[in-house]
Each structure stands twice: as structure tokens, then as C-alpha cells.
Amino acid sequence: RKDEVIALRLFPAKMKKRAFSCSTFMIYLGVDKLYEEEPHHHVLFADDYEENVHDIQSEERVSDDMSIYIRNSSITDPHVAPEGHSALYILVPTINRRHDQDWDSFKKEYRDKVIARIEEKTSMKDLSDHIVEEEILTPANWQEDGVFVGATFNLSHNLGQMLYLRPHNQYQGFENCYLVGGGTHPGSGLPTIYESARISTNLICDQYGVDYEFVDYASDYLNGRVPRSEKTTEAVLSQ
């Protein structure tokens, strides 16, 4: 079929030419202690941040001098863990799967380095002594779950792949092929992906003559038509 010929000819070649985002090394922890002195969001930057970013973008090696994001959500939401316990979300940006790192053999070693850095740089000096539940996701796991080359933020946001220059929501080689997600217009990040879904949904409705209410949340917000008390994710999603 014509569609199959187009797909075989274009997709592999185009994907190889694209620049992709970093991947992430994730640690999800259940901890039998509250770290009330730690903020909800905490970012530990690499000592040599420029070198850390270069390691990731060049896709050459896993950086030992890593940057770490920690979400300590239990201090603002007591329901995410049992009383007196914490749920910690730890994200480490790292190289994607275009680099042939053996994560199965390296996972434990890298995990220990991340925990050691957190204990050194934060008030969670005894973190390793209080871990009761643990789950780790490596770039290899992301790839196994269908994330292309384990690039968790999809196409990178360089000047040649931003906004209109990202793949369009209606693919121009197929009549009934619509795209949605972080790799399409307008970009990655949860709010932006919601917008991508809205754009694609509206395009499908337009094609099949389905009426829908066009809601311009940005204009409503800026023009004061949404009360400040309602300017929350929950309020928007419930409408």
C-alpha cells in the first residue's frame, strides 16, 4: 500500500537525523522517616554543571558528577505515604540509549552514587538507613517501555525542533494519521502535552464535522474571566 511505502521510506531516515533529549535515571523510595527540613522540590546541581550538560548532550558517557532533582512530596501531602513515612521521587538526567551503556550491570553502582550524593549534599544524612521500598528505572527500562532511545523528553528542544518545527499534529504523508505527545507540536512537558492532545482532538473533530466548544484558557486567565481561586489544574481539568 502507498501508506506503507511512505512509512518505510521516511520514518527510519527521519528519526536518525533527529536530535533527542536526555534520558533519566529514576529512583522511587518509600522511607520510614519524615524529612521535614527538606523542601518539596530540591535540585542539586553538578559541581561542574557545564561538564555535566556536555556529557549528556554529547551522548558519550554517564557523568559521575550528576545533577539530581528530589521531590519530597510528603511534607505537603500527608496522603502519599503512611504516617511518619516519606515518598521520595529522585530524577537524574543522563545519556539516552544512543550510547550503549550496560545499565543492567551498572544500575546498582550508579544508584549508590546517587544516594551517597544526596546524603552528602542535603540534610538526609541517614537516607540509606531508612529505605523500606525502592523502585529504579534506567534509560534501558524507558526504552523497553516504548520510549524511543529512552529519551524521556522525546525530541530535544533545539532551535530546529521547536514549536512549528516539531512534527505536526496531522502527519502530512497520511490522510488519517494524527500525532500527539511530547515529540509533536508544541513540545514536551505535561501542560504542553495536554495542549498537543487538544490540538489533535480538535483537528480530528474538524475532519469529521464534530462540533466542540473551543476554550481559550490562556485568554480567559489573562483577561480575568477565570477567578483566581479556580486557577488550578483541578479546576481546568474538571471543565
Residue ranges and their predicted role:
Residues R1-A81, L222:
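Mid-domain catalytic core of redox enzymes
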Residues G30-D32, P82-E119:
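Conserved FAD/dinucleotide-binding core of flavoprotein oxidoreductases
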Residues S63-Y69, M124-P186:
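A glycine-rich dinucleotide-binding beta-alpha-beta segment and adjacent secondary-structure elements
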Residues P78-H85, H168-G173:
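Short glycine/proline-enriched loop/turn "hinge" motifs that connect secondary-structure elements
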Residues G182-I204:
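A conserved FAD-binding loop/helix module that cradles the flavin
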Residues C205-Q239:
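Active-site-proximal substrate-binding core of FAD-dependent oxidoreductases
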